């Protein structure tokens, strides 16, 4: 089970950096996300036939990324780094994304999910360098 401090942080934010890799060449893209607490999953919208990160994630499902609070105050630094598996979103995940971003309904986006396999949360509000980790059970 993911620590409540991590889920609270991820629920509060909405933009992640998705990192993919093809032929040992990394790539990063910013994506809006909805977070599924129960399944430790991010849901994003991307066209896997047109975007570089989408094309690469379909070819190599192993992805990584981050979500960070932008601050200059060291004592307030918070953020996660994660690895996960990219896959098609299920119906519950699609509903969650469209609830979080209702204006996206008009665009009929392709929705995809990232099942978090490992996550490290840095939270300096709990003490300098305080880190919490999550490991998927499968």
Where are these regions (language model features)?
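Charged, amphipathic alpha-helical segments
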Residues: 1-4, 48-52, 95-97
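A short, Trp-centered hydrophobic/proline-enriched beta-strand micro-motif
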Residues: 8-23, 63-67
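A generic structural signal for nonpolar/aromatic side chains embedded in well-ordered alpha-helices
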Residues: 10, 55-57, 97
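A generic structural signal for short beta-strands and their flanking turns/coil linkers
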Residues: 12-16, 29, 38-40, 59-63, ...
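Hydrophobic residues embedded in beta-strands of well-ordered beta-sheets
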Residues: 26, 40-42, 119
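A short mixed-secondary-structure module that forms the rim of ligand-binding clefts
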Residues: 34-72
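Charged, gly/pro-rich active-site loop segments
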Residues: 74-138
């Amino acid at each position: 089970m993911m620590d409540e401090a991590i889920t609270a942080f991820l629920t509060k934010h909405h933009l992640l950096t998705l990192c993919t890799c093809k032929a040992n060449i990394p790539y990063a893209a910013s994506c809006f996300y909805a977070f599924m607490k129960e399944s430790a999953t991010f849901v994003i919208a991307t066209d896997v036939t047109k975007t570089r990160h989408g094309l690469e994630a379909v070819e190599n499902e192993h992805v990584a990324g981050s979500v960070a609070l932008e601050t200059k105050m060291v004592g307030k630094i918070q953020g996660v780094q994660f690895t996960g598996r990219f896959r098609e979103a299920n119906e519950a995940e699609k509903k969650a994304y469209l609830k979080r971003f209702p204006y996206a309904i008009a665009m009929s986006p392709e929705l995809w999910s990232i099942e978090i396999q490992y996550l490290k949360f840095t939270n300096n509000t709990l003490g300098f360098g305080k880190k919490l980790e999550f490991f998927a059970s499968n």
